[in-house]
Amino acid sequence: MPKSYTDELAEWVESRAAKKRRRDEAAVAFLAVRADVEAALASGYALVTIWEHMRETGKVKFSYETFRSHARRHIKAKPADVPAPQAKAAEPAPAPKTPEPRRPKQGGKAEKPAPAAAPTGFTFNPTPDKKDLL
């Protein structure tokens, strides 16, 4: 007797779930070889060379773009060695002075800005003059 469609569908979903890779599988694999990658980079090897070797030896199974993004995120983005905090100076450095914006006076006439010079060259006029047309 043939299986019903729902039984076939249930088997297919289960087999597909078993084959489906985890999203973080590449990150976990990279973190497992992170120390090796750091040592190889410190020795002067290129990132693509390190990835090719690890791919051939089976240490990583993901693309170079993924490898590169994990290297950037987990190795190259680390902050540089921060020096030990020094004792605070007795006087803090003076803050740079910024000029205060000019405000118009409350009473009297408000200053009018100087009219801008007429632009030279082409200017678009949406309502053309009849005399300017051919």
Swiss-Prot record:
The keyword Lyase does not apply. The keyword Ribosomal protein does not apply. Keywords: Plasmid. The lineage of its organism: Bacteria, Pseudomonadati, Pseudomonadota, Gammaproteobacteria, Enterobacterales. Residues 99-112 have a biased composition (Basic and acidic residues). It comes from the Bacteria. Residues 74-134 are annotated as: Disordered. This is Protein TraK. Residues 83-92 have a biased composition (Low complexity). It comes from Escherichia coli.
